[in-house]
């Protein structure tokens, strides 16, 4: 004797069963590091992280001198003060998928995919993308980019005045 089972779905239940898994979120960040006319220029250390009220800060990337012998570049990470206080002091560097080399002046595009590195999947709500730069023998600056995440994604932009130029972010699926 052979027993067989059939399940018949109709309407929205059928559409739900056929739906593909939700695509990963991608956060594209465009960051401008201004060219400076100073006698001794050092590339800035840059930290990018996400904050949401009531949730721990999530480091997306920390750009510093990763090639310095004996991880010597990590010594100066505490100069990226706001990031250091928010989440840096608890991070072991170099962190896989998070640490990267410093960048030269110019416009840079960085992309973060949910589930990789430090990028979480963002539920709808209000977030702040924090971008902080600090330079040896230079200044430091923090730029806050507000992101109102909806099911459709989010967009935000802000601009620095000295160590950072324009910063924009686009969250999409």
Name what the model sees in each region.
Residues 40-47, 124-126:
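Short coil-to-beta strand junction motifs in C2/discoidin
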Residues 105-110, 118-173:
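Glycine-rich, aromatic-bearing surface loops/beta-hairpins
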């Amino acid at each position: 004797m052979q027993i067989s089972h059939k399940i018949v779905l109709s309407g929205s239940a059928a559409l739900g069963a056929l739906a593909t898994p939700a695509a990963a979120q991608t956060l594209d960040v465009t960051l401008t590091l201004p060219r400076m006319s100073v006698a001794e220029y050092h590339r800035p250390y840059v930290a990018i992280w996400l904050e949401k009220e009531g949730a721990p800060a999530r480091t997306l990337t920390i750009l510093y001198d990763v090639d310095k012998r004996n991880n010597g570049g990590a010594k100066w990470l505490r100069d990226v003060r706001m990031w250091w206080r928010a989440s840096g002091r608890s991070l072991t560097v170099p962190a896989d998928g998070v640490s990267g080399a410093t960048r030269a002046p110019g416009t840079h595009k960085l992309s973060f995919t949910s589930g990789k590195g430090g990028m979480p999947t963002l539920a709808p709500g209000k977030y702040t993308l924090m971008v902080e730069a600090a330079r040896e023998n230079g200044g430091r600056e923090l730029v806050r980019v507000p992101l109102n995440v909806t099911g459709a994604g989010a967009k935000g932009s802000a601009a620095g005045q000295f160590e950072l130029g324009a910063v924009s972010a686009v969250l999409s699926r």
